[in-house]
Curated annotation (Swiss-Prot):
Gene behind the chain: ssp1
Name this polypeptide is given: Serine/threonine-protein kinase ssp1
Organism: Schizosaccharomyces pombe (strain 972 / ATCC 24843) (Fission yeast)
CDD domains reported for this sequence: STKc_LKB1_CaMKK
Reaction equations catalysed: L-seryl-[protein] + ATP = O-phospho-L-seryl-[protein] + ADP + H(+); L-threonyl-[protein] + ATP = O-phospho-L-threonyl-[protein] + ADP + H(+)
Pfam families xrefs: Pkinase
Protein family per UniProt: Belongs to the protein kinase superfamily. Ser/Thr protein kinase family.
Length: 652
């Protein structure tokens, strides 16, 4: 538990230090330079009192948050994070544009998205950690309808990352396998967009791990430690007006960049807006996004008319139920409507339109008049912006360029003119996400190939007699550094278990082998039968690609990575696993060790708690284990209690 608390402390404390040294618009109004935009005196009075409204309990009237606004409706590949920033962190919020730019420069050092076609999953039984290639899995951050998100750490750079695990096909395909192809299309689309979109307010993709033999795709993303944007607490808002305004500005910048690149998100909502350590909001989840590089036409309109996303954030043109009137044309204005609903949620802690039934909700979105609560008071500028964002007619709805120029959006900025100039998306080059890039975003796996892979993966290896001169395949759970002096020699889990099970088949053969390896033990009781020893290692840590091993075991959130200690004693090589650092690993000494090459694996188990109290020539033996009496290991609290030995041929 101590390591967990220390780890969380190291993650939180630097954030506070950064925020303390940044500019706060709430207290630095006197430093705001004059701007070309008109001032609204009424808003300065609102701003002075806006930060304290969170302490009050404002009634939401007769409105309730309907289940339709939750995560379960329609949204695919949703980030569902468990960590939420506490209210004590909200007061440290500030104008974070400069800090976001510094972090953005660090993310740009990643370069192009790395594509890996080979995946190696490992589970370390000694430390309880799981590894996907060189990423250490720490814990689960959350899961949605079609995927899950893990917190990982790069074992090389020690950087925290988010690993999104997405199945290539639906687990429960429905009529005509339509869902399977739909899921593939969502995964392809999200990967293709994340590969090309590079913006400070869009979640950055670092690596795509896509093994053709795997049924899942692993997306390595930047870690958003703040989780989802908080917006409601028992139908009451949790953000001040200035905080909601800053979050809103970040979303506007990210959404403007996406529209400039010809990408319509189609699922803008607070659950898909994530916070990083500097409280910068970034847009995530592009599973239902639409790519329209060539402009919008009739085919685009038909595709955009499909109701994907979250119903509570649907635009009126998506909810059209009147057959007597023509439906308005569908365009990127649906994202502007969802942006307005999101701003309403951030300000008032609830959705503008709610109903118990989906059809009733659609009718309200199309026909019901927008009702803006009087508390908290967002001023005339805020009301004007909400009305223009939530305009029923998409032709009359405000555009994102107009949103950026709106006085309510610019209020509180140090230099609005410079902000508009630096955030212009036309200063960056356009990216094109072609149909071929979407189609080739992931590798396809045939059903026959998957079945054959599972068949060979679960088949136990045939028993064979080990030759002392032959090398043994390495166990996936044993990770050791490469050595230039010796070849990589190891022992697989199933082979180790089979080797011990074969010792109980033939008693005479067992006695002969015991005489060669453990003559002292034979002198005590040569007729004593040892029970059949099965370590339970003859199964894989990850049974198959459809079920992760993390569902069956808990996480150990220690900071250290399992290390390997190796010593050479005569003709034996000893490997020991420990969760300590390399400098703390006790050395193994075995002077005068005389081992005979039997070609049989030997497992030595020592009870080091009582090791010092025992005579030097006494070696405790656990029934079912074959131990080596001549192996002297260093005692003490730092000495590992487990080691694996096997014969090998040293290389000169």
């Amino acid at each position: 538990m101590g390591s967990v608390n220390n780890e969380e402390k190291t993650l939180i404390e630097p954030q506070r230090l950064l925020r303390k040294n940044t500019w706060h618009p709430e207290v630095d109004d006197s430093e705001v330079p004059p701007s070309v935009f008109p001032e609204y005196p009424v808003h300065k009075a609102i701003q002075k009192t806006s930060d304290s409204f969170r302490k009050r309990n404002y009634s939401a009237g007769d409105y309730v948050i309907a289940p339709l606004g939750g995560e379960r409706e329609g949204s695919s590949l949703t980030h569902s994070w468990t960590f939420q920033p506490g209210k004590h962190n909200q007061r440290l919020y500030s104008d974070n544009f400069q800090e976001a730019q510094r972090q953005w420069k660090r993310l740009q050092e990643w370069g192009e998205v790395k594509e890996t076609k080979k995946i190696r999953k490992r589970f370390d039984r000694f430390s309880g950690r799981k590894y996907i290639n060189h990423y250490e899995i720490i814990k689960e951050l959350g899961r949605g309808m079609h995927g899950k998100v893990k917190l990982g750490r790069d074992t090389v750079t020690r950087e925290l990352l988010a690993i999104k695990i997405i199945p290539k096909t639906e687990r429960r395909p429905k009529l005509g396998r339509a869902n399977a192809s739909s899921q593939k299309e969502k995964v392809r689309r999200e990967i293709a967009i994340l590969k090309k979109c590079v913006h400070p307010n869009v979640v950055r993709l670092r690596e795509v791990i896509d093994d053709p033999s795997s049924t899942k795709v692993y997306l390595v993303l930047e870690y958003m430690s703040g989780g989802e944007v908080p917006w409601t607490d028992c139908d009451s808002p949790v953000l001040s007006i200035s905080e909601a305004r800053q979050y809103f500005r970040d979303v506007v910048l990210g959404l403007e960049y996406l529209h400039y690149q010809g990408i319509i998100h189609r699922d803008i909502k607070p659950a898909n807006l994530l916070l990083n350590s500097s409280n910068c909001v970034k847009i995530s989840d592009f599973g239902v996004s639409y790519i329209a590089n060539a402009g919008l036409n009739e085919d685009n309109d038909v595709e955009l008319a499909k109701t994907v996303g979250t119903p509570a954030f649907f635009a009126p043109e998506l909810c059209w139920t009147d057959l007597d009137r023509p439906r308005p044309k569908i365009s990127e204005a649906i994202d502007v409507w969802a942006l307005g609903v999101t701003l309403f949620c951030l300000l008032f802690g609830r959705c503008p339109f709610n109903a118990s039934m989906e059809y009733e909700l659609f009718d309200k979105i199309v026909n019901e008049r927008l009702n803006i609560p009087s508390t908290p008071d967002i001023g005339e500028e805020g009301r004007d912006l909400l009305k223009r964002l939530l305009c029923k007619d998409p032709e009359q709805r405000i555009t994102l360029v107009e949103v950026k120029l709106h006085p309510w959006t610019l209020d509180g900025l140090k230099d609005p003119e410079k902000w508009l100039q630096n955030t212009d998306p036309s200063t960056v080059s356009r990216v094109e996400v072609s149909t071929d890039e979407v189609a080739s975003a992931i590798s396809l796996v045939g059903r026959l190939r998957r079945k054959l892979g599972k068949l060979f993966r679960f088949r136990r290896p045939k028993a064979r007699v080990f030759d002392s001169s032959s090398s043994v395949p390495s166990d996936s759970s044993i990770c050791r550094p490469e050595s230039s002096g010796n070849s990589s020699i190891g022992l697989s889990a199933s082979e180790l278990s089979d080797s011990f099970n074969r010792l109980a088949v033939n008693e005479s053969q067992k006695d002969r082998e015991r005489k060669q390896v453990h003559p002292v033990e034979m002198g005590r009781n040569s007729s004593e039968k040892k029970p059949r020893c099965d370590f339970g290692w003859d199964y894989e840590a990850f049974p198959n690609d459809n079920q992760d091993a993390d569902d069956a075991c808990s996480y150990n959130t220690g900071d250290s990575i399992p290390q390997v200690s190796k010593s050479i004693n005569g003709h034996f090589e000893t490997y020991s696993r420990t969760s300590m650092d390399t400098d703390d690993v006790a050395s193994f000494e075995s002077p005068n060790a005389k081992h005979e090459e039997s070609g049989m694996p030997v497992v030595t188990f020592r009870n080091y708690e009582n090791y010092d109290a025992n005579p030097s020539n006494f070696h405790p033996v656990v029934p079912g284990f074959v131990s080596s009496p001549n192996l002297h290991l260093a005692g003490g609290s730092d000495t590992p209690i487990y080691c694996i030995e096997h014969s090998f041929t040293p290389t000169n």
